[in-house]
């Protein structure tokens, strides 16, 4: 182990404690390969200790007055704002995305804390003073208990902040299993929450992999699981946790289609598609994966997309004006290369080859923006979630065909349309099978105050993340009917 590189600790019961396991994994900077830290691959015993701490803390936290919980969240929001630049830099270091994108991610996370700080309003019930003569009835919200969260590498700030601030604001306690690929930001979030006055045991962090995940899914004292990650794992999480009697929300894979109509403003469409396809190295559930070009606009659209992709600066996300950083690991880079080779083999036309960019030949896990034209729905690159800076272009003649292509995918996280025609927008809105829709913009981004998630194989569960769906997920209701 490299001298001077720290091994991260778990956060259990308000204390930083070493894992019972001696096994660790390196956390490299994806842009350089430099090891930033080592993360413990914790055991079921570590997880059990965290759940026990959360269960004990729930006894008092669930009874803490809601306004006091809100004041702690307000203080937490202030601390996050004060440390905004530090947090953004940490995201770039361990994830690789550009500093500008990381800065925006911190904003999204802070917005989630701001929403959660409205707990006194969010936790309000309802009353009807007279359901019959002399009888009144009311609904009251209560926390559900210990909640488990399992988060991915691609948004180490935003996704955890979808989960634990709102769960905690509602009176629950929380055990977070962050991605072992980006664990450092999670620890910093816990430090700042403690500084804000959060009592010990309300938030716990256990680093690790399969043992910790399975422990959360199976532990009888964990009442709910929130998950964001790949489709196969999300389906497993949903089925396993549900089989153990837990409430589950699992946000999973995507293959988002962007439909470009003949009347579209091409300047806007190209700008938005480039940002959506290649921002965060394509490693996001709302990335534009497929462009469906309608009618005779296709040739010019492809030409403009390639020209714009050629202007993208690739490199270390901490460098000024860098737009496209590395993918998360060398193995993911090779997986992307394999998909590019497969796309060529299956007959798609490679109009921009990201393997040839200069940055790909140096240190770090870089792959340049890659664009395929004349992709068809029987090709693997159309079917699979590649999760990398690879864009496929499908050509069709009508909006009906474009909608048919998009709806054919088993994924249904999001879709966008570029048009100036309100009739096109209405048809798109009503007929597309997806949860997050955009018009003349590339990423219909999650907002703290509205529900966020997809349909079909992009989501398992009933209640989505964020907004009042999130409040519903983290609370249960009691009805009181009284005669006086």
Curated annotation (Swiss-Prot):
It comes from the Bacteria. It catalyses: 3-oxopropanoate + NAD(+) + CoA + H2O = hydrogencarbonate + acetyl-CoA + NADH + H(+); 2-methyl-3-oxopropanoate + NAD(+) + CoA + H2O = propanoyl-CoA + hydrogencarbonate + NADH + H(+). NAD(+) binds at residues 153, 177, 180-181, 230, 252, 385. Transmembrane segments: none annotated. Pathway: Polyol metabolism; myo-inositol degradation into acetyl-CoA; acetyl-CoA from myo-inositol: step 7/7. One of its GO terms (biological process) is thymine catabolic process. Keywords: NAD, Oxidoreductase. GO terms for molecular function: malonate-semialdehyde dehydrogenase (acetylating) activity; methylmalonate-semialdehyde dehydrogenase (acylating, NAD) activity. Its EC number is 1.2.1.27. The active site is at residue 285. Pfam families: Aldedh. Belongs to the aldehyde dehydrogenase family. IolA subfamily. NCBIfam families: MMSDH (TIGR01722). Homotetramer. HAMAP family: IolA (MF_01670). Catalyzes the oxidation of malonate semialdehyde (MSA) and methylmalonate semialdehyde (MMSA) into acetyl-CoA and propanoyl-CoA, respectively. Is involved in a myo-inositol catabolic pathway. Bicarbonate, and not CO2, is the end-product of the enzymatic reaction. This is Malonate-semialdehyde dehydrogenase 1. It comes from Geobacillus thermodenitrificans (strain NG80-2).
């Amino acid at each position: 182990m490299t001298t001077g590189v720290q091994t991260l600790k778990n956060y259990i019961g308000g204390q930083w404690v070493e894992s019972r396991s001696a096994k660790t994994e390196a956390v490299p900077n994806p842009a350089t390969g430099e090891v930033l830290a080592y993360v413990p691959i914790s055991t079921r015993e570590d997880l059990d200790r965290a759940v026990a701490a959360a269960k004990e803390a729930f006894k008092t936290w669930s009874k803490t007055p809601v306004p006091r919980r809100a004041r702690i969240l307000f203080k937490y929001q202030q601390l996050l704002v004060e440390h905004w630049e530090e947090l953004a830099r940490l995201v770039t270091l361990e994830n690789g995305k550009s500093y500008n994108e990381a800065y925006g991610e911190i904003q999204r996370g802070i917005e989630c804390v701001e929403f959660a700080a409205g707990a006194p309003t969010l936790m309000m019930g309802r009353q009807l003073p007279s359901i019959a003569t002399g009888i009144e009835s009311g609904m009251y919200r209560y926390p559900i208990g210990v909640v488990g969260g399992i988060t991915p590498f691609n948004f180490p700030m935003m996704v955890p902040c979808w989960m634990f601030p709102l769960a905690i604001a509602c009176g629950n306690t929380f055990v977070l299993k962050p991605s072992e690929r980006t664990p450092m930001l999670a620890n910093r979030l816990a430090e700042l929450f403690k500084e804000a006055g959060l009592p010990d045991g309300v938030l716990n962090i256990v680093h690790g992999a399969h043992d910790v995940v399975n422990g959360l899914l199976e532990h009888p004292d964990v009442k709910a699981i929130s998950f964001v990650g790949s489709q196969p794992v999300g389906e497993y999480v949903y089925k396993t946790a549900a089989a153990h009697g837990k409430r589950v929300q699992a946000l999973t894979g995507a293959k988002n289609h962007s439909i470009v109509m003949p009347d579209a403003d091409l300047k806007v469409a190209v700008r938005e598609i480039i940002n959506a396809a290649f921002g965060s190295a394509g490693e996001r559930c709302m990335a534009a994966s497929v462009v469906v070009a309608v009618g005779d606009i296709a040739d010019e659209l492809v030409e403009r997309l390639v020209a714009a992709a050629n202007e993208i600066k690739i490199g270390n996300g901490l460098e000024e004006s860098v737009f496209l950083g590395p993918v998360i690991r060398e193995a993911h880079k090779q997986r992307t290369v394999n998909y590019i080779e497969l796309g060529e083999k299956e007959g798609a036309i490679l109009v921009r080859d990201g393997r040839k960019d200069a940055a790909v030949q140096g240190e770090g896990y870089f792959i340049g923006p890659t664009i395929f034209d004349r992709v068809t729905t029987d090709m693997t690159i159309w079917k699979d979630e590649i999760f990398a800076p690879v864009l496929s272009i499908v050509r069709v003649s009508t909006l009906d065909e474009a909608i048919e292509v998009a709806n054919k995918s088993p994924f249904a996280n999001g879709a966008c349309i570029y048009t100036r025609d309100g009739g096109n927008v209405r048809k798109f809105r009503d007929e597309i099978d997806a949860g997050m829709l955009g018009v003349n913009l590339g990423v219909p981004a999650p907002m703290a105050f509205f529900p966020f998630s997809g349909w079909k194989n992009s989501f398992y569960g009933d209640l989505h993340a964020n907004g009042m769906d999130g409040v519903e997920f983290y609370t249960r209701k009691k009805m009181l009917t009284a005669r006086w």
